[in-house]
From Swiss-Prot:
Named cofactor requirement(s): Zn(2+)
One Pfam family named in its UniProt record: PMI_typeI_C
Species, as recorded: Neurospora crassa (strain ATCC 24698 / 74-OR23-1A / CBS 708.71 / DSM 1257 / FGSC 987)
A GO cellular component annotation in the UniProt record: cytosol
Protein's UniProt name: Mannose-6-phosphate isomerase
Length: 459
């Protein structure tokens, strides 16, 4: 008889310099709960950036009780993934689940699509360790700031007209061509106008990124002085989001973190986003972004490929970044994800994936799904709001990883019942019914899972 497919995991934490220090880092807090005292103690002077949950070889999760890696367990028993997923994803978990704790901005970056990833990996495996694409989703668990996708073009045109240092670095000819094209195509949504707009966007952005280090440094000094002296009037009147005062503060803060950097100017090309806990954004492969501050749950296709171009001491690949981007532009609202009630049917998509007991219903507990337009992963957030509240996840034909982010309770699969509290992480095998029961007034978990599109139950 096979063991019950409920496995408590030990998960490693990465200490990148952009992470929050010591116990202020959720990634560190959760790692401390996941690992034994003799294996991990939080150092208050050390930054802790990412907790990794999954089978990726850079930081693989392990069975807490046997020490074997989750990858070994999956490869020994394909039923944990389901035969269809094991075949589709070469006996590996299709997704990588993370907690990020961000004190200092991450690099201006994008993740290559599948075709480009294969090419970059073959050419430069040191800097591009995977041949897979990396679409990703970020769900805030504290106040979050980030840069995501290109702004509406009228906003960029406003900045080129009102931020002399930006116009100087892009160059007068490119800036003028951009502003004139955007004005001429205003309100024109034809394919031809969109293609023309994307072309001038790539031209202006490419010119910025191709400018010399000396020119960028001189322009950065001018930009920082202007931001400091102008305050709320920075960038002129009728300022696009997030407003002159906030943009001035951001320029000062990011300059304090990185000094003169191309990222200070990329700021004016990208949407600035603020999220409260529970809000989410989805980033496709080839979408440009940078996280600035906060704590997030992040889920992505299993890859560690990053093409960077600013706010980083690491390897930069500006040419590839400029050439790979889609140059789609849209308000940030179009990148935010609206979760759906996971206890209800979604027409033509899936049946209800979970049920609540009466105690959970009475306390207005929430079970919602964030379901991006790819099949490698979805994420369900469960917030049980009273002791005795219970959610039962229906069996799905795919694997799940569950992390508790606040409170405590019990997790059970079949006859196996275990304690789960803040920082605990569990793997649940395919086709298993899983029950969470709260022993707290606020018991929150996030569950990442994969089912293939042909199956309607759960995705």
């Amino acid at each position: 008889m096979l063991p019950v497919p409920l496995i408590q995991l030990q998960c490693g934490v990465n200490s990148y310099e952009w992470g929050k220090k010591g116990n202020s880092s959720r990634a560190a807090q959760f790692a401390a709960a996941s690992l034994d005292d003799n294996e991990f103690k939080i150092d208050e002077e050390k930054p802790y950036a990412e907790l990794w949950m999954g089978t990726h070889p850079s930081n693989p999760s392990k069975d807490k009780h046997t020490g074997r890696t989750l990858l070994e367990l999956i490869q020994d028993n394909q039923a944990l993934l389901s035969p269809a997923i094991a075949e589709r994803y070469q006996n590996k978990l299709p997704f990588l689940f993370k907690v990020l704790s961000i004190q200092k901005a991450l690099s201006i970056q994008a993740h290559p699509n599948k075709k480009l990833a294969e090419k970059l990996h073959a050419r430069d495996p040191k800097n591009y360790p995977d041949d897979n694409h990396k679409p990703e989703m970020a769900i805030a668990i504290s106040d979050f700031e980030g840069l995501c996708g290109f702004r509406p073009l009228k906003e960029i045109a406003h900045f080129l007209d009102n931020v002399p240092a930006l116009r100087q670095l892009v160059g007068e000819d490119k800036a003028k061509a951009f502003v004139e094209t955007v004005k001429r195509n205003d309100g024109n949504e034809s394919d031809e106008a969109t293609a023309e707009n994307k072309k001038v966007l790539q031209s202006a952005f490419g010119a910025l990124m191709a400018s010399s280090e000396a020119d960028m440094t001189a322009a950065a000094d001018k930009l920082v002085q202007s931001a400091k002296s102008a305050g709320a009037d920075f960038t002129g009147t009728a300022v696009p989001s997030p407003g002159g005062a906030k943009l001035s503060e951001l320029v000062g803060r990011l300059h304090g973190q990185f000094g003169a950097d191309y990222g200070l100017f990329v700021l004016f090309f990208l949407n600035f986003v603020e999220m409260k806990a529970g809000e989410a954004i989805y980033l496709r492969a080839d979408d440009i972004h940078a996280y600035i501050s906060g704590d997030i749950i992040e889920c992505m296709a299993s890859s560690d490929n990053v093409v960077r171009a600013g706010f980083t001491p690491k390897f930069k690949d500006v040419d590839n970044l400029v050439n790979m981007l889609t140059y789609d532009f849209a308000p940030i609202e179009q990148q935010k994800m609206e979760p759906t009630d996971y206890t209800q049917d979604v027409k033509n998509k899936r049946e209800a994936g979970a049920t609540l007991n009466q105690t959970a219903i009475d306390s207005q507990s929430e079970i919602v799904e964030y379901n991006p337009p790819i099949e490698e992963f979805s994420v369900v957030r469960s917030l049980l709001k009273s002791q005795g509240s219970k959610v039962t996840f229906k069996p799905i034909d795919g694997p799940s990883i569950i992390i508790c982010t606040q409170g405590q309770g019990k997790i059970s699969v079949g006859p196996k019942v275990q304690e789960i509290k803040k920082g605990h992480v569990f793997f649940v095998g395919a086709t298993a019914e899983c029950v969470l029961e709260s022993e707290d007034d606020k018991f929150e978990t996030f569950k990442a899972f994969c089912v293939l599109d042909e199956q309607s139950n759960g995705n």
